[in-house]
C-alpha cells in the first residue's frame, strides 16, 4: 500500500501544471530590538524603507508570504527587549515588502497588555494584512479562526499558537 501511495504522490506531483502550483514563503520573527528602532528614527518619525531591500524581491515574488510578527504595535513608548512595541512605520514596511499574512500568537503578543494586542490587530486590519493567532474577543475568534485564504485556486488554512506569553495573563476566551 505504501508503494501505491508513493507512486500516486509522484504522479500527482509530476502532473501539476504551472497554474496548479502556489509558492508559499514562510519567514521567522519580524521584530524590533531597541538598536533597530533607534536606527530607524528620523526626525519626528521612523523610516524603514531599507529594512527589507535585500529580500524584498523574494518576498514579493511569492504567491503568499507569511511572517511571524514578534512585536506589538502598541504605540509609544517604542521599545525592544523585553517588552516589544514597534513603530507603526515598521508594519508599513512589512506590507510594502510584500508580506500577505502575519502570525501574531507568540510569547511577545501581550508585551503591551490587552490594549497593545488590540491596537496591533487594529493596525493589521487597517492595512488589510491577513493575520492569525490573536483576537480581540471570542466573537472575532469564532469568525476568523481558522484563517482561510483562497489564492490562485488553492484554499490555505493557517493555524497559529504559542507556548506562552512570558508570564502575562491571557483571556482564555479570546
Predicted features along the sequence, with ranges:
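Sec-dependent N-terminal signal peptides
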Residues: 4-14
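Acidic, metal/ion-coordinating pockets
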Residues: 18-174
Amino acid at each position: 500500500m505504501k508503494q501505491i501511495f508513493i507512486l500516486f504522490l509522484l504522479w500527482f506531483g509530476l502532473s501539476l501544471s504551472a497554474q496548479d502550483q502556489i509558492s508559499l514563503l514562510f519567514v521567522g520573527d519580524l521584530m524590533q530590538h531597541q538598536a533597530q528602532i533607534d536606527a530607524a528614527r528620523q526626525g519626528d518619525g521612523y523610516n524603514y524603507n531599507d529594512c527589507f531591500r535585500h529580500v524584498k524581491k523574494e518576498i514579493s515574488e511569492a504567491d503568499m508570504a507569511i511572517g511571524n510578527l514578534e512585536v506589538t504595535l502598541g504605540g509609544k513608548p517604542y521599545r525592544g527587549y523585553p517588552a516589544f512595541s514597534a513603530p507603526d512605520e515598521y508594519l508599513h514596511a512589512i506590507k510594502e515588502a510584500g508580506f500577505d499574512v502575519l502570525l501574531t500568537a507568540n510569547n511577545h503578543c501581550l508585551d503591551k497588555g490587552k490594549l497593545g494586542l488590540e491596537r496591533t490587530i487594529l493596525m493589521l486590519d487597517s492595512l488589510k494584512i491577513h493575520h492569525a493567532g490573536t483576537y480581540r474577543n471570542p466573537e472575532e475568534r469564532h469568525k476568523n479562526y481558522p484563517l482561510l485564504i483562497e489564492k490562485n485556486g488553492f484554499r490555505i488554512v493557517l493555524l497559529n499558537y504559542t507556548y506562552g506569553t512570558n508570564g502575562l495573563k491571557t483571556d482564555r476566551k479570546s
